[in-house]
Amino acid sequence: IDKVKMLHDPTSPYAISASFAMGRAMDAEIYDAALGTAYTGKNGNNPIVLPNSQKLAADDKGFTFAKLKKLKRMFDSNDIEEHNRYILYTAAQLDDLLGEEKVTSADYNAVRALERGEINEYMGFKFIQLNGVRDTGKKIITADTVSGKTVRHCVAFATNCMKLGIGEDVKAEITPRADKNYSTQVYFEMAIGAARLEEEGVVQFDCVES
């Protein structure tokens, strides 16, 4: 009974670990849907890929101020709502931006990013750092190796152009496993899915990592 109670205690190690795991699963679902194939039509059998017009090449650079400006221009040109724009990136891209004077200087940015070592919101985007890994051991935000360099595929999107659906809320159980000498198994489950609704509100931007 005490173990079952721990599942519902938000401060318990079980609940905290499960919360992190579920959070990573939701992050991966949203990220994959943003860059993956969306399906339209009455029967959902019409595949739509993210067009090249919604992709920014790395150009052998990391996450620069110039690249951030291009992202803003793309969203503005597509008349995308200003108040719900997000950027998904990793610690490597944050490090790039913290080296950009216009991002860290108080003359340009009231947030004073360099003092805090983080960027929460800038140029109309809210920044979300995703460093979590998948079950495969690879990062949620995927990368390829190009000419010996790691190229990270980051994402900028507007919330009204993406959709996350929760088909089944979290189910939690603690049971002994007879095949494991009756050691305790903690089981969490939920059903989720995500889809890209409008290509104009999603941009893949690639960044070289040093």
What are the roles of these predicted feature ranges?
Residues 1-43, 76-91, 127, 172-196:
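Long, contiguous amphipathic alpha-helices that act as assembly "spine/axial" helices in icosahedral shell
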Residues 36, 92-96, 133-135:
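Short, catalytically relevant binding-site loops at active-site mouths
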Residues 42-115:
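Extended, solvent-exposed, turn-rich assembly/linker loops in the middle of proteins
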Residues 5, 51, 55-63, 100-210:
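Sequence/fold signature of self-assembling virion shell proteins
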